[in-house]
UniProtKB/Swiss-Prot annotation:
InterPro entries, per the entry: MECDP_synthase, MECDP_synthase_CS, MECDP_synthase_sf
Alphabetical list of Pfam families matching this protein: YgbB
Site, Transition state stabilizer: residue positions: H34, T133
PANTHER family per record: 2-C-METHYL-D-ERYTHRITOL 2,4-CYCLODIPHOSPHATE SYNTHASE, CHLOROPLASTIC (PTHR43181:SF1)
Source organism superkingdom: Bacteria
Positions with a binding annotation for a divalent metal cation: D8, H10, H42
Subunit details: Homotrimer.
Gene (name only): ispF
Organism: Endomicrobium trichonymphae
Top EC class of this enzyme: lyase
Cofactor note: Binds 1 divalent metal cation per subunit.
Function of the protein: Involved in the biosynthesis of isopentenyl diphosphate (IPP) and dimethylallyl diphosphate (DMAPP), two major building blocks of isoprenoid compounds. Catalyzes the conversion of 4-diphosphocytidyl-2-C-methyl-D-erythritol 2-phosphate (CDP-ME2P) to 2-C-methyl-D-erythritol 2,4-cyclodiphosphate (ME-CPP) with a corresponding release of cytidine 5-monophosphate (CMP).
Full protein name: 2-C-methyl-D-erythritol 2,4-cyclodiphosphate synthase
Length: 160
């Protein structure tokens, strides 16, 4: 069994869609980034890649590459999962915390779990998604951005 940790943060920007866990959340600000800036999925991808001993998402999906401009992070997660499968890895469980003052994401967690479950072939019961605030401290507390942390556990089947 291997364990990986991931972190991501993005600034909020007016006029951008807010996408977390592959779910569009209606709000006046979204996350600014080269892709759709889904911090939840970005943290998860880095946790999975780290557990497998691979490079981070910046290596696989450089933000200077125009083909990743506004790309769906769910599609990037599909690519990460394919890379893991090539090396005979399977995912045991994932646990993700989103640090956000607003909006409240609780109503969207079931859909986020469904999106992740579908892509990484993991039962929803093995996917933890939680949210917390930063108690008005720091860039998240001031409403300037959103951050996420993730832990992933994976196993590797031995080749015969």
């Amino acid at each position: 069994m291997y364990i990986g940790f991931g972190y991501d943060a993005h600034r909020l920007k007016k006029g951008r869609e807010l996408i977390l866990g592959g779910v569009k959340i209606l709000t006046s600000e979204g996350l600014d980034g080269h892709s759709d800036a889904d911090v939840l999925i970005h943290a998860l991808m880095d946790a999975l890649l780290g557990a497998a001993g691979l490079n981070d998402i910046g290596h696989f999906f450089p933000d200077m590459d125009p083909k990743y401009k506004n790309v769906s992070s769910i599609s990037l997660l599909e690519s990460v999962y394919k890379e893991l499968k090539k090396q005979n890895f399977s995912v045991n469980n994932v646990d993700i915390t989103v640090i956000v003052e607003a909006p409240k994401i609780c109503p969207f967690i079931a859909d986020m779990k469904e999106n992740i479950s579908r892509v990484i072939e993991l039962k929803r019961e093995r996917i933890g998604i939680k949210a917390t605030t930063n108690e008005k401290m720091g860039f998240v507390g001031r409403g300037e951005g959103i951050a996420a942390v993730a832990v992933a556990s994976i196993s590797q089947e031995k080749k015969r």
